[in-house]
UniProtKB/Swiss-Prot annotation:
Record GO terms (molecular function): calcium channel activity
Entry's family note: Belongs to the transient receptor potential (TRP) ion channel family.
Name of the molecule in the record: Uncharacterized membrane protein C1322.03
Pfam families in the record: TRP
Organism of derivation: Schizosaccharomyces pombe (strain 972 / ATCC 24843)
């Protein structure tokens, strides 16, 4: 039997209705106390309340409060007809943030009822202390009239006076009332869902289109095979970080502290972030009683004894509209999320196949790669829902039993403890560890766990998992003590700040360490603001509401930060695809907050082609002898050498006189062989003019140019062991529609460091000269504090007694280019070889024979 199309739409309608529909419950009581300025007077009867019961009429949307208490003495009741009638009365006033909202006056005899018979009125007069009675306080406004007060606490004050002309006060009590989110519930839910979708689309946009690791292959784009810091910078504070912060915000409402009910209602509207919302078949009206016949008049009893079921997880589940057995709707929502994750994984695989067809690219894939990618997507979902799994399943250990408790226990043991231990055993003993970053099998399955950490910090993923586990146990099991929960939350956030600030598991170029430290600091401030809400401190009234507003303000600021980073992500990737680049003038691509690097005024100036004659130092040259089409963009010279004449009297091209530390003058006519003329006192280098080097405007042979110095603050060191893939292949090799004028294959070494051609052997000859300053051996770093202190003392003494003369500061560096080497014929030196002893004897004998022969020829013959 085929599923009909309308059944699918009906299922989606039920899911979204459950996600975004408001809870149809009654208002909730926040606190109940006696007025601080009420002092019982002698001789006047008093009414001592000991319980509060709230009631709500679903038909006419009216609600009222029943206060149960004991009466001491006889209340004077004056009745009869006439214009001057005095009777015992009940005054009720409702305030919102100190402003009067409504007031009502009712005769006491009209609202007094028997607490044991319920809704049975007591006739006036009645005997003192004969029975307790209830005072019914009605509100003559419907619930819709209070919709604008859904995000605040309605403080109600009830005053009972007798029927005497003096109107003696019998009792005075205050309690807080919070209405359910009826109108603001969909607004908050839709707003957060749209924000999360916006962050998600920005991450997808950056993963596939960034100029470093962007690729048609979604496996490589999503799991970031190259571990490129620039790509990680664009994806920092993404979808997972946003969801985890929402889970933290929801967990604050699950702590047993005296939060106002409206704060818990707001966090309940975000409960879908913890895989729990009001599913229709498990929903029930929020009819939780604040205190049902709690004897507050007994001295041994205290207000804090009744808090565990008034705040924390109980109140949070009450705001959602489900019972304490929350594990069953949680598992149903998890099944829905599981199918959603499978659908997204299959959609990614389909897009991979579709893009390969469109661009005619052959993407090598195997069946194992596909299955491992699907399994890796499920692991992502598992870690995304790890905190609610631990929190809701562990809560069943202390919740009232409802049957089938073995299911949440087994779920907690398997998914809360066994799976993390199994993953640790699989990843901790992989040899070599680089296999985790190079093997596609590990990256497909487990890459989402550690692919944002550095290689030496790849096992740092254990720390956030341990923090999530401890936070879940805290809100699930330790609900009876709000102080203990606050202490554990404080320790966890301090550990987070120290871990990200000291261990620094992410690449420095990504700014993820700084951003995670900032988020942890915001969470720590939130926990500190929760401390005054401890039940033992009894902070009530407006002060408690202001603390809740401050915490909500922090949550809003963090959400705005996520939206700003997503906007910057969209704009930076779009600008780079359109041709913007920040590599010119040595500005690195890995700078944080690349928005200004793309659209800043300095970057816009660098993109303009400068006039070759705009430089004042080059305008002193004779322009008439040069062709403007053959001129290159001049760089900043130091000075111009004058009186440069050729042998025939013509003016020679101007020369640059560049100061150096240890390189002697080098010209075409000068010999590179050490001689007496090239002395160590030479400290300058004669180079050709910056107008002559080759450039896009000229094809002439260029020799050298001078690059001005850069401020040290604008250069950010990179990790030397990280390679960069700066070319977006599928955009550069595709039709003109996707092509852009950006060369991402420029090496960083060509930007920052002087380029020296290997064909120039003059540097090797210069290095052989005796006057070159060679680098001295660097002593090994000291091992302990004593050696460091001794090294400081030695360096200080050496600088005092052997102070060197001040040297001229370095003015930049010279980039040498290849030039035709002059063919210099060097005369070969005459070799003088000492003869051996036999050779000397033969040579002397030969000389003797020659002399005898000459003397013989010189004797005259007879």
């Amino acid at each position: 039997m085929k599923p009909r199309p309308y059944s699918v739409f009906l299922f989606l309608h039920i899911v979204f209705y459950s996600l975004l529909s408001a809870v149809n419950g009654s208002p909730s009581l926040d606190y109940f106390e006696t007025c601080s300025n009420f002092v019982p007077r002698a001789g006047i009867p008093t009414f001592s309340p000991y319980a509060v019961i709230k009631n709500f009429d679903e038909v006419n949307r009216m609600y009222y409060i029943q206060v149960v208490g004991n009466l001491s003495g006889v209340i004077t009741i004056v009745g009869g007809n006439g214009s001057h009638i005095h009777a015992a009365s009940v005054y009720s006033e409702t305030y919102a943030l100190g402003k009067l909202v409504t007031s009502n006056t009712t005769k006491l005899c009209d609202v007094v009822m028997d607490p044991h018979s319920f809704e049975v009125p007591i006739k006036c007069p009645w005997a003192a202390g004969s029975a307790a009675f209830m005072v019914k306080v009605p509100f003559k406004s419907t619930l819709s009239d209070y919709s604008k007060y859904e995000l605040t606490t309605l403080t109600t004050r009830v005053i009972v006076v007798d029927g005497t002309p003096e109107k003696n006060v019998i009792t005075c009590m205050k309690f807080g009332l919070s209405t359910t989110l009826y109108y603001f519930y969909p607004v908050i839910s839709y707003l957060v869902v749209v924000s999360l979708a916006y962050v998600s689309f920005s991450i997808i946009y950056a993963l596939f289109l960034n100029p470093w690791t962007g690729s048609l292959d979604p496996f490589k784009s999503i799991f970031n095979f190259n571990m490129d810091p620039d790509a990680l910078r664009l994806t920092s504070l993404g979808f997972f970080d946003f969801v985890q912060y929402l889970q933290f915000a929801v967990s604050t409402a699950q702590v047993s502290v005296m939060f106002p009910k409206f704060y818990i209602n707001i966090m309940a509207a975000l409960s879908w972030g913890t895989a729990l919302f009001r599913f229709p078949i498990f929903s029930e009206p929020a009819e939780y009683q604040f205190a049902d016949f709690a004897d507050l008049s007994v001295a041994s009893s205290s207000y804090a004894d009744y808090l565990p079921k008034s705040y924390g997880m109980y109140s949070f589940l009450d705001s959602i509209g489900i019972g304490t057995a929350c594990w069953l709707p949680f598992l149903i929502v998890m099944v829905i999320y599981l199918f959603a994750a499978l659908f997204v994984a299959l959609l990614v695989i389909f897009l991979k196949w579709l893009m390969s067809r469109i661009f005619n690219e052959t993407i090598a894939e195997t069946r194992w790669d596909t299955w491992s990618f699907i399994a890796g997507s499920l692991i992502r979902l598992y870690f995304l829902t790890y905190f609610p799994t631990v929190a809701y399943m562990s809560f069943q250990f202390v919740a009232p039993p409802t049957g089938y408790e073995i299911i949440p226990v087994l779920w907690f043991i398997f998914f809360g403890i066994f799976i993390p231990v199994y993953l640790y055993m699989n990843l901790a003993f992989v040899e070599p560890s680089s296999k985790l970053l190079e093997d596609q099998t590990y990256l497909h399955l487990f890459g989402s766990i550690y692919n944002s950490f550095r290689e030496e910090r790849v096992m740092f993923w254990i720390f956030p998992i341990a923090v999530q586990f401890m936070r879940g146990i805290t809100v699930g099991v330790i609900g009876s003590s709000g102080s203990a929960q606050l202490a554990i939350f404080f320790i966890l956030e301090v550990a987070n700040v120290v871990a990200y600030a000291y261990v620094r598991p992410h690449f420095p170029q990504t700014s993820m360490n700084t951003l995670n430290t900032f988020i942890s600091t915001m969470r720590l401030i939130t926990v500190i603001l929760m401390i005054p809400l401890d039940p033992r401190l009894k902070v009530l009234g407006i002060s408690r509401d202001l603390l809740a507003y401050a915490i909500l303000f922090i949550h809003i600021m963090v959400c705005i930060l996520f939206l700003l980073l997503s906007t910057q992500r969209f704009m930076e990737v779009s600008a780079r695809l359109l041709g913007a680049k920040s590599e010119s003038k040595g500005v690195p691509l890995d700078r944080p907050f690349g928005w200004a690097r793309v659209f800043g005024i300095n970057e816009l100036r660098r993109r303009r082609l400068k006039d070759p004659y705009s430089n004042g130092n080059t305008m002193m040259f004779d322009h008439s002898t040069y062709n403007s089409n053959e001129m290159s963009v001049p760089l900043t010279p130091v000075s111009v050498c004058s009186n440069s004449l050729k042998k025939d009297g013509e003016a020679a091209p101007p020369k640059l006189f560049v100061q150096t530390n240890c390189i002697p003058p080098v010209t075409q006519a000068s010999s590179l062989v050490p001689s007496k003329n090239n002395t160590a006192s030479s400290s300058s280098l004669m180079l050709d003019s910056p107008v002559t080097p080759s450039s896009p405007y000229s094809t002439s042979q260029g020799y050298s140019f001078y690059r001005p110095p850069k401020p040290k603050s604008s250069v950010r060191k990179r990790d030397m062991d990280q390679l960069r893939a700066l070319q977006l292949d599928f955009l550069n090799n595709k039709p003109n529609l996707l092509r852009h004028d950006v060369n991402y294959a420029v090496r960083e070494a060509d930007v920052y460091h002087p380029h020296v051609d290997t064909s120039i052997d003059s540097l090797s000859q210069i290095s052989s000269q005796p006057f070159e300053m060679r680098p001295t051996a660097i002593p090994p770093p000291p091992k302990n504090a004593f050696q460091r202190a001794w090294q400081i003392v030695q360096s200080t003494a050496k600088s005092i007694w052997h102070s060197d003369p001040p040297k001229e500061s370095e003015k930049g560096f010279v980039v040498l280019r290849s030039r035709p080497r002059p063919n210099l014929q060097k005369p070969l030196p005459q070799l003088h070889i000492e003869p051996s002893r036999d050779e000397q004897y033969s040579m002397e004998r030969k000389k003797t024979d020659d002399s005898l022969a000459e003397s013989a020829w010189s004797i005259p013959h007879p």
